[in-house]
């Protein structure tokens, strides 16, 4: 299928800072938004289905969310002013909407990743989520839940509160007093790229240590890895943006591909182990039945 490269409006008088979105880029942007939402819903559904977020690194999720928040604020800081000017003076309504899809992409990722964080927090494994109070002898009471929350639960709660506060703070700054501030945008872009690199380290370590992907959704990563490269390309075409805006997505896609291969390796290894165990159990059952038949043949009927 060939996509038309024609724009939504045909006006050669638009300045270079107001590029016209093509039909192809608009269609790809819509697909990316839908794909992002579906991919993160797959992660949420896996956590809910397992009833546990075991195997997911909290540092991985928090750093990833900070990176997305910073990238969203970077797009706001660089794009709001030129996009407003272009929409008021040069774009038609269709073209204005088409050129806001990049902002919608990153914004939808902020919202849905926040839902993933909440799902992680709600389904923390109970032995980690809560600790039991001590009885009169100083021994822990074996109860699944307790009023006294665990240290890790408090850490996750404070972490969520802190990152949501940070997100609200930088988004407000980027949309108001620091709009079109290139130094601020560069800081956000570099920090987003840094988080994109560092976030995968704790998850890779946790995956190798457990030798399992746990609650981490492989279908989510299979959708997001190629999508990350496409998002980076589409963001590079937006008015007012530069390489600090899309670099995070390129780096994230590369490292997520590495994590995906690691998870698929351990999944294949686990399936092979289960097949060997099932085969061994079948052989043992057949051997037991054969031994019973031999014993019955030797002893004969009573």
Curated annotation (Swiss-Prot):
**Record field: transmembrane:** 25-45, 58-78, 104-124, 158-178, 182-202, 215-235, 247-267
Q: Which PANTHER family does the record associate with it?
A: PQ-LOOP REPEAT-CONTAINING PROTEIN, SEVEN TRANSMEMBRANE PROTEIN 1-RELATED
Give the membrane topology, semicolon-separated if more than one. Answer: Multi-pass membrane protein
Domain (PQ-loop): give its ranges.
175-245
Name its cellular compartments.
Membrane
Protein's UniProt name: Uncharacterized protein C4C5.03
Q: Which UniProt keywords apply?
A: Membrane, Transmembrane, Transmembrane helix
Taxonomic superkingdom: Eukaryota
One cellular component (GO) term of this entry: membrane
Q: Name one Pfam family in it.
A: PQ-loop
Q: What is its main location?
A: membrane
- Species in which this protein is naturally found: Schizosaccharomyces pombe (strain 972 / ATCC 24843)
